[in-house]
A protein has these predicted regions:
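N-terminal export leaders
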Residues: 1-2, 25
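Sec-dependent N-terminal signal peptides of Gram-negative exported proteins
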Residues: 3-18
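Formylglycine-dependent sulfatase
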Residues: 17-349
Length: 349
């Protein structure tokens, strides 16, 4: 079966799509966000008005899949355009003994072909805010994100100081302003923590789901918090006046995590993100797709993929035809930018 590069049909529709002006690009990559965990995908009680807004103002691609059912290999694929096995990355980066046991490196090789570096070389200001996990905070000598073609960053699951998980949009908006003042297009990896454990809950948001049991309310509040920050980002683009010049993508690294049946609600601690609720509050759903995080079934790798670019990408469209893989992203962007094209395992059309 032939994989199409996402938006390939749009390129044929819009000759001279970019002209002399390159769009800004924001890639929102959630963590463990299930395909069914969106209002626009029919969830019965989750509130995701801002992601739903992206869907109503853009195209919702239903046949997108990532390259792994877990974090680090999935992120490797979107950054390199290669399947993660090429780099012997088949699980999440952990501490050194664990990586050695699995014959994994301790971090992604910074010399790999990288989306951020291609964009940087094409004149983009590049930034990364949120989860990293192309190394690990338990490996203090691992390369920082700046070694990967990234101009500015705030991150966790990396060496050095750990960014507070809810500061992603707070840090991204000033970067957008600075890039605009410099007259440079920008690319932002906004790799959100939600809804990975630990769940860090705002009590005011949890109170909006008082009709639910505690675990469901915690999960719903966690996703609402992420959606609210996405709304702040979209409103910021509106206020600055660059909405029409900005491609915004929302997706997830893999499907939702689920604990064993009757997993008790309890607190758990993560060295990068701190204290919060554990798998007892993991209530993500896949919209009927089989299996969950960690699986190569559709529930583990079939994730949301919504793209908005006003005037360029059709609004309010649901695409159930185009088959898209995460490894298609790098060659698509590189091809659009007319940079030196790399050899990848993906195909262009």
């Amino acid at each position: 079966m032939k994989f199409s590069v996402f938006f390939s049909f749009l390129i044929s529709l819009y000759s001279g799509l970019w002209g002399d002006k390159r769009p800004n690009i924001i890639f929102i990559f959630a963590d463990d966000w299930g395909w069914g965990d969106l209002g626009c995908h029919g969830h019965p009680y989750l509130k995701t008005p801002n992601i739903d807004r992206l869907a109503s103002e853009g195209t919702d691609f239903h046949r997108f899949s990532v390259a792994s059912g877990v974090c680090s290999p999935s992120r490797t694929a979107v950054m390199t355009g290669h399947f993660p096995a090429r780099y012997s990355i088949d699980g999440h980066f952990a501490w050194v003994p664990s990586n050695q046991k699995r014959n994994m490196p301790d971090w992604l090789n910074p010399q790999a072909p990288l989306l951020t570096r291609f964009l940087q070389e094409a004149g983009y200001a590049t930034a990364h805010y949120g989860k990293w996990h192309l190394a690990n905070d338990m490996i203090p000598d691992s390369p920082l994100p700046t070694a990967y073609g990234i101009d500015e960053y705030g991150a966790f699951n990396c060496a050095g100081p750990q960014m507070f998980v809810h500061d992603d949009v707070k840090m991204a908006l000033p970067f957008i302003e600075r890039s605009r003042e410099l007259g440079k297009p920008f690319f932002i990896n906004l790799w959100m923590h939600e809804p990975h454990t630990p769940f860090h809950v705002d009590p005011k948001l949890q109170a909006e789901f008082s009709e639910l049991d505690e675990a469901d309310a915690i999960y719903a509040a966690t996703l609402l918090h992420a959606d609210t920050r996405i709304g702040e980002l979209l409103n910021g683009l509106d206020e600055i006046g660059i909405t029409d010049d900005t491609l915004v993508i929302f997706s997830s690294d893999n499907g939702p995590a689920r604990g064993a049946p009757n997993t008790p609600l309890s607190l758990t601690y993560d060295t990068a993100t701190g204290l919060g609720y554990g798998l007892g509050a993991a209530k993500g759903i896949t919209g009927g797709r089989k299996e969950y995080k960690g699986s190569l079934m559709e529930g583990g790798i079939g994730v949301p993929f919504i793209a908005r670019w006003p005037g360029k990408i059709p609004a309010g469209k649901v695409d159930q035809t185009n088959i898209i893989s995460a490894v298609d992203l790098v060659p698509t962007f590189v091809n659009w930018l007319k940079s030196t094209f790399l050899q990848t395992t993906a195909q262009t059309v």
